Amino acid sequence: MKLVIVESPAKAKTIEKYLGRDYIVDASGGHVRDLPEKAIGIDVKNNFKPEYVIYPKKQDVVRRLAGLSKKAEKVYLATDPDREGEAISWHLMNALGLDDNYSRIMFNEISKRAVNEAIEKPGKINMDLVNAQQARRILDRLVGYELSPVLCKKIQGKLSAGRVQSAALKLIVDRDREIKSFVKEEYWSVTAFLKKLTGSDIVFKAVLESKCGKKIKLENKEKTDAVLKELEGKDYTVESVKKSVTYGNPPPPFTTSTLQQESSTKLGMASNVTMQIAQQLYEGLDLTGLGHIALVTYIRTDSTRVSAEATAKARETLAEKYGEKYVPQKPNIYKSRKNSQDAHEAIRPINLELTPESLKDKLQRNQYRLYKLIYERFLASQAAKAVYDSVNVTIKNGDYAFKSTGKTMTFDGYTRIYAAAPKEEAGEDNEKIPPLADGEKLELSKLSPEQKFTKPPAKYTEASLIKLLEDKGIGRPSTFATILSTLYKREYIKKDGKSLEPTELGELVTVYLEKYFNDIVDAKFTARMEEGLDKIEEEGADWHKILNDFYPPFREKIKEALSCLLYTSPSPRDYAASRM
């Protein structure tokens, strides 16, 4: 008998159907060991040696798996192919006393081909990944265990601070400060509604842009009225008509981050809900008539890379369903973001023959909606570009120049499969302009001045915050949903519609951390820590170094905060400072 251990029963059920009777597939239910719940569990003086204990609720699981492993001729550890998965396998190896009688297997998708290929090419646990996870866990424990009690003494209540959550909270607080301190400024625009003298009744808009070649600024009504007076009674003449063909590029396939962003924007799903459903699609579901199958590849990835086999299948599907003109001459290849680990493919369907429509009656509503989003995004990523006829017209009135732009789609390309985002759609057919010639005179229908005011920066949504966290290198895409969930749970932030706002408690916590622990809330510092963890994983850097570099100065700040800390209630001054 051979034993395969995975994290979840759903994943076990999917894998079991692909292996023969010689295999037993069982689940650990995630981590079986961790640092102790009621003690720090780290010997700082002994090079940050961690003390791992088996979760009380996992004692029976460990006993069961240990019994099976003793009977097995071979044990395969098949946890997820990332830091956390590697750490789970390492803890299982130690808790079960496997010594060298194990193999580590990984797959990017749970399919018969992928599982059997992994069985045929077993490896061993990658200690660089384990050490990166250990370093992160110890860092987070040190910060949480030592800093949270300080917050509780300073501010009433059971509070927590975290290495990543606090930096994310500060971004939200800072944006709220920007909005509250924003002073709107008046400005004006002037729009001419024009049409041809003959041959067309189309009225189109042109916006005043410059005077004597310099961009014009109209700060008030007086300046605007003066310009309107100068424009009176003068001809509107076409100075130039510039036509061009422009292209709309298809979007890349999803990464963990972009899936969460798009699911929030298009489906209105919270990031934690998106990840829960995506996990179900990855691990496998019982589908009527199909059995227990997985639908998408591994969902924790920052890569847009796709296998040659999957790319070829996408191109074949496009040709069959939409015609050859929707297939570009060469496959679309996308560059992954800077600092992406690129260990896994992008998120994509495992089997393109399982279309969303064919599964609609077999999936729950949100499972169907998310699968449809992933399926269509992947297919569109290999489709041809959208094509537009664009026209830019400059119209003169004396020294003044007006601009009018129009864009008409001539080939829908990828947009036939995957609807463009609202901001892209806004640019299409934005002004219907009749055929015009240089030097042609136009008739003015009306001249419309409009008072406007500058707007404050927008509040973050879950989608825009996740994008910012990724751009700044705060956390990893796989942790973004957890970061947000923690901030909600601690009542540091709240939602107003789709917008994120800090609570008074969140503001107060940030003010205190800025004063005594600025590194913890500094985005650049947090990003450098993430880079250090990446170096442990990718280059085998010494994992103790990042802890030795971080902890001594952090401990001094803890001592400083405690030395001047006699319990004080939150004061009006604290709240006022948070709003400055």
Model-derived segments and spans:
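Intrinsically disordered, low-complexity regulatory segments
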Residues: 1-137, 146
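Basic, low-complexity terminal or inter-domain segments flanking catalytic cores
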Residues: 2, 14, 23, 148, ...
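Core structural elements
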Residues: 136-145, 249-256, 276-290, 334-352, ...
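Metal- or metallocofactor-binding catalytic centers and their adjacent structured scaffolds
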Residues: 217-252
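Positively charged, low-complexity/disordered segments
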Residues: 572-574, 578-580
